[in-house]
Regions:
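All-alpha prenyltransferase/terpene-synthase fold signal
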Residues: 1-298
Length: 298
């Protein structure tokens, strides 16, 4: 009887310990999710405030009213916030990357405006949206948002704030490549060719990679450059951003209901997190949470 009671107590103790451990992990995960959400929400609020200050509705109203509207009408993308997070991960203040993050948002806004023009030949998977301005105005405004983003970058070249002109120039080159024919334009063009008969995992991944993937890769690389990262760190974060953006595209864009997408997303998550293995510390956990919100170190 004594032996049986002893075994019972041991099992109870083990069960209690296991439950306690699970409770600790669960509570830590909940706290981590809340902290990570706050981390990204704060960054996005700062970017929005910066853009509202940079693009107020002012004279000439015919130019700045549609630009202001289209800047904030675009759906949320995490690429600008990733730019800030990468800069902070490299040990620099987010103010160093704010203009770059805003420029990346403007690129996203410009392409969103062009994608949703009420014209024939629009991708079959693009829903109708409400238009506040004539198509010609939205077309021209989208064209104007791209150079305006580069203007924000050039104006941020303040030596008194330790902004290195060479870094700014490199970031401008990164963003112009993103906006060019081998970047998002390529993805948009390939998406135009899609129809119900030719959607397979290969074309889905390609379109998502060239659109959201390249956008996030650019954001992460620009943040790392402005944060003072070494070349290997910049390239690791570029690859991380590419995987993150491709995942985001697959989750929310073309082919999101296609069979095999979930399996591909899980593989991309593994590849993305692998790029961060050499980066340590609290900020690494924060930047990882863009694809794994419950990531926690106990």
């Amino acid at each position: 009887m004594a032996t049986g009671l002893s075994q019972f107590k041991a099992k109870t103790s083990l069960l209690t310990h296991t439950r306690s451990r699970r409770t600790v992990v669960h509570c830590a995960a909940v706290v981590s999710v809340e902290q990570n959400h706050s981390f990204w929400a704060t960054i996005e609020a700062d970017i929005e405030a910066y853009l509202k200050k940079a693009i107020p509705i002012r004279s000439p109203v015919t130019v700045f009213e549609p630009m202001h509207y289209l800047t904030f009408a675009a759906p949320r993308t995490t690429a600008p916030a990733l730019c800030i997070a990468a800069c902070e991960l490299m040990g620099n203040d987010r103010g160093h990357a704010m203009a770059a993050a805003s420029a990346i948002h403007l690129m996203h806004g410009a392409y969103h405006a062009h994608e949703h023009l009420p014209i024939t030949g629009r991708p079959i998977y693009k829903p109708e949206i409400q238009h506040e301005f004539e198509p010609s105005i939205e077309l021209l405004t989208g064209d104007g948002m791209v150079p305006f983003g580069l203007e924000l970058l050039s104006r941020s070249m303040d030596l008194a704030q330790n902004h290195n002109p060479d870094k700014i120039l490199r970031v401008i080159i990164e963003i112009t490549r993103l906006a060019g024919s081998e970047g998002m334009v390529d993805g948009l063009y390939r998406e135009l060719e899609l129809n119900d008969s030719n959607i397979d995992m290969g074309i889905i991944e390609y379109v998502c990679k060239k659109k959201e993937g390249e956008l996030h890769a650019c954001g992460a690389a620009c943040g790392a450059i402005l944060g003072g990262g070494a070349e290997d760190e910049i390239e690791k974060l570029r690859k991380y951003g590419l995987y993150v953006g491709t995942i985001k595209g697959m989750q929310n864009g073309v082919g999101k209901d296609n069979k095999g997408v979930e399996e591909k997303i899980e593989k991309l998550k593994i590849l993305a997190l692998k790029e961060l293995e050499s980066l340590k510390g609290k900020k690494m956990v924060s930047i990882s949470s863009i694809i794994e919100p419950s990531l926690v170190v106990i």
